[in-house]
C-alpha cells in the first residue's frame, strides 16, 4: 500500500495562488484566467488519468447551466473564474485543496469508484462542488480535489460563515447574547473527521477488493 497521505491546504491570493491556475495545472489543460486577462497552458503536463467536476444534487440553476455542454476542464475553468471574479480581496481565500494518495492494491477503475463514493458522501452531500483529477504517477497514484469555501446560492455564492446551531436546531449565542458563527466549509477542528471519513471509505473499498484485514487499519500520521 502507498504511504497514507491526506492533506488539505487553502488556495489563497495572499500566498500567490490562483484557483484557475491550480485547476489548469491539475487538469493538464489550457484555461483563460479572466481576472488577469491571460491564458494558462498546462497541456504539455502529463499524468492525468481521469477527471470529474461534480455538483450537488440541489445545485442552483446557474451552476447547472454553466457546466452544461462543457468538458470537465471547461466546467472547471468556468466555475473557478466565477469564484475568482466574486472574491474581491487581495488576500481572498478561493478554494480548499485536498491531496490524497490512492491505494496501490486497487485498480484505476476501483480507485475511481472509491473517489466517487467519497465525493458523494463527504463533498457534494455537504453542498460543495467537487473538482477532482486522478494523476497516475508511477508508484504514486493520487488525487487532487478542489472544493468550494462558500455555499452555492440562487444568485451566486453565500457567506463563508454561518450561524452555529445547537442540538435543538436553534442558533447558539454567547454570554453576551450574540450569535456564534462557524465556517461553512469546516474549520481546522473538522479536519480529523474529514480525513477519517476518507480512510473509512478507503477501507471499505479495500475490503470489497479482498485486501487482507491487517491492511485496513491505515490512518494518517
Regions inferred by a protein language model and the residue ranges of each:
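N-terminal nicking endonuclease/strand-transfer module with a His-rich metal-binding environment
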Residues: 1-221
Amino acid at each position: 500500500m502507498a504511504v497514507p497521505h491526506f492533506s488539505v491546504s487553502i488556495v489563497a491570493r495572499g500566498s500567490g495562488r490562483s484557483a484557475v491556475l491550480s485547476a489548469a495545472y491539475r487538469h493538464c489543460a489550457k484555461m483563460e484566467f479572466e481576472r488577469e486577462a491571460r491564458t494558462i497552458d498546462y497541456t504539455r503536463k502529463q499524468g492525468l488519468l481521469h477527471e470529474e467536476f461534480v455538483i450537488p444534487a440541489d445545485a442552483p440553476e446557474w451552476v447547472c447551466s454553466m457546466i452544461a455542454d462543457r468538458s470537465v476542464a471547461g466546467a472547471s475553468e468556468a466555475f473557478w473564474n466565477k469564484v475568482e471574479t466574486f472574491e474581491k480581496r487581495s488576500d481572498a481565500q478561493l478554494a480548499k485543496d485536498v491531496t490524497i494518495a490512492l491505494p496501490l492494491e486497487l485498480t484505476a477503475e476501483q480507485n475511481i469508484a472509491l473517489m466517487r463514493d467519497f465525493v458523494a458522501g463527504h463533498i457534494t452531500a455537504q453542498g460543495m462542488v467537487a473538482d477532482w483529477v486522478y494523476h497516475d504517477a508511477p508508484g504514486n497514484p493520487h488525487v487532487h480535489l478542489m472544493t468550494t469555501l462558500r455555499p452555492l446560492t440562487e444568485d451566486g455564492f453565500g457567506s463563508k460563515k454561518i450561524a452555529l446551531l445547537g442540538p435543538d436546531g436553534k442558533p447558539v449565542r454567547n454570554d453576551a447574547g450574540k450569535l456564534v458563527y462557524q465556517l461553512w466549509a469546516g474549520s481546522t477542528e473538522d479536519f480529523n473527521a474529514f480525513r477519517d471519513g476518507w480512510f473509512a471509505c478507503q477501507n471499505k473499498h479495500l475490503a470489497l477488493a479482498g485486501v487482507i484485514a491487517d491492511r485496513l487499519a491505515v490512518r494518517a500520521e
